[in-house]
Design a protein with these regions (language model features):
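Helix-to-loop transition at the C-terminal end of transmembrane segments
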Residues: 22-41, 55-64
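Aromatic-rich transmembrane-lumenal/periplasmic boundary elements in polytopic membrane proteins
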Residues: 29-48, 79-85
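Short helix-coil transition/hinge motifs at the ends and kinks of transmembrane helices
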Residues: 32-35, 105-121
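Short hydrophobic/aromatic helix or loop-helix immediately within or flanking a transmembrane segment
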Residues: 49, 67-114
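Transmembrane-helix motifs of polytopic, lipid-linked glycan transferases
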Residues: 99, 120-136
Length: 136
């Protein structure tokens, strides 16, 4: 591998790392008014905690979640059977799954009491998945 190719790889990794940390910093400082998982993103993301945290593919658990802080509603529709239907497809959740599972394992190992699918490690994994696919 020649020197220029190595330099490009390091520059790319540096820019990707800066992008991740700046995004996380802006969410933490309140520059963005909401958490990374909100509004439409919440609808795409909810398949992951439904399957891996709550073991509830019928999404009954959404009735116990706090309201979306962005004020967005209309993501879920209760059915006569008692199940809840998410109007968003699961393609985004499938792409986010490796990052979510890593966050879930880290949370279970170090902070099992906050393994709810929405705590800080899950939020950071959501940022990481967005940055990863942006640079891909």
């Amino acid at each position: 591998m020649d020197l220029y190719k190595k330099a490009y790889i390091w520059v790319f990794l540096l820019i990707a790392g800066i992008t991740f940390f700046m995004t996380a910093f802006f969410y933490k400082t309140g520059f963005f008014p909401y958490t990374p998982i909100h509004s439409d993103g919440n609808g795409y993301y909810l398949y992951l905690p439904a399957w891996f945290v709550y073991h509830d593919p019928g999404m009954h658990f959404v009735q116990n979640l706090p309201p979306d802080p962005s004020g967005f509603s209309g993501t879920f529709f209760p059915m006569p059977t008692g199940q809840v239907v998410d109007k968003y497809t699961m393609g985004v959740a499938i792409l986010q799954m490796p990052f979510f599972l890593l966050a879930h394992v880290i949370t279970l190992l170090f902070c099992p009491e906050i393994a709810d699918g929405f705590s800080i490690f899950y939020q950071l994994s959501n940022i990481a998945s967005g940055c990863f696919y942006y640079f891909l």
